[in-house]
Amino acid sequence: MSDKKYNVDEGEIAKFSRIADKWWDKSGEFKTLHDINPLRLDYIDGHADLRGKRVLDVGCGGGILAESMARRGAAFVKGIDMAEQSLETARLHAALNNVADIEYECIRVEDLAEAEPHSFDVVTCMEMMEHVPDPAAIVRACANLVKPDGMVFFSTINKNPKSYLHLIVAAEYLLKFVPKGTHDWKKFIAPAELARMCRQAGLDVADTKGMTYHVLSQTYALCDSTDVNYMFACRPAF
């Protein structure tokens, strides 16, 4: 039997549980996720074509990305997270907005990979790996969940002085875009490190893109620099 507490940071769960009712407040604590969501949705859809696909969103939180993928045409979307309060918010929002073919479950991705291997066309794990003790285990589980002809998407934060200045000093303390303590620089992941995790899990990195934030328009755009936020689009290597 697997250890249900393995790879779960209880402090992170408690942190997001305290603000679970704020997930759909577009000017609140999760404003940056709402700002970034159109870009990551288009990136995923552009590579994988969500129409008619079975999709898994790992670390779905309150359902911002999961719900938008369902609206984009996915046949079925499953969102998983370890913060039950966030999932309650996601379920309520989907029900109130008549979003069908979507479900949420409080389960570790490692356990789901054992129960439902190779069962999803698209697996997304966005802005999540910097919140867990063992991100490599998350990558392996995502690789085990995707179908042989499917795609896996990751997004996270580079680990360097620039990302510390942008996402902790500026975003948390100066501009107050996100609550203090949202990020832990020690958990940030360099692209080379994530690429190594992908290779070891049997995934080929098909595309890498950085994301840059335009303060005046409060929108994100793709860029070539992976100095701060970045995304990977991956395919099974076998």
UniProtKB/Swiss-Prot annotation:
Transmembrane intervals: none
GO molecular function annotation: 2-polyprenyl-6-hydroxyphenol methylase activity; 3-demethylubiquinol 3-O-methyltransferase activity; polyprenyldihydroxybenzoate methyltransferase activity
CDD domains: AdoMet_MTases
Binding residues annotated for S-adenosyl-L-methionine, in chain numbering: R40, G59, D81, M126
Catalytic activity: a 3-demethylubiquinol + S-adenosyl-L-methionine = a ubiquinol + S-adenosyl-L-homocysteine + H(+); a 3-(all-trans-polyprenyl)benzene-1,2-diol + S-adenosyl-L-methionine = a 2-methoxy-6-(all-trans-polyprenyl)phenol + S-adenosyl-L-homocysteine + H(+)
Pfam assignment, any one: Methyltransf_23
Record keyword S-adenosyl-L-methionine present: yes
Keywords for the protein's UniProt record, in alphabetical order: Methyltransferase, S-adenosyl-L-methionine, Transferase, Ubiquinone biosynthesis
The UniProt record lists the keyword Transferase: yes
HAMAP family documented for this protein: UbiG
Xref: PANTHER family: METHYLTRANSFERASE (PTHR43464), UBIQUINONE BIOSYNTHESIS O-METHYLTRANSFERASE, MITOCHONDRIAL (PTHR43464:SF19)
UniProt name for this protein: Ubiquinone biosynthesis O-methyltransferase
Species in which this protein is naturally found: Neisseria meningitidis serogroup C (strain 053442)
Organism lineage string: Bacteria, Pseudomonadati, Pseudomonadota, Betaproteobacteria, Neisseriales
Gene: ubiG
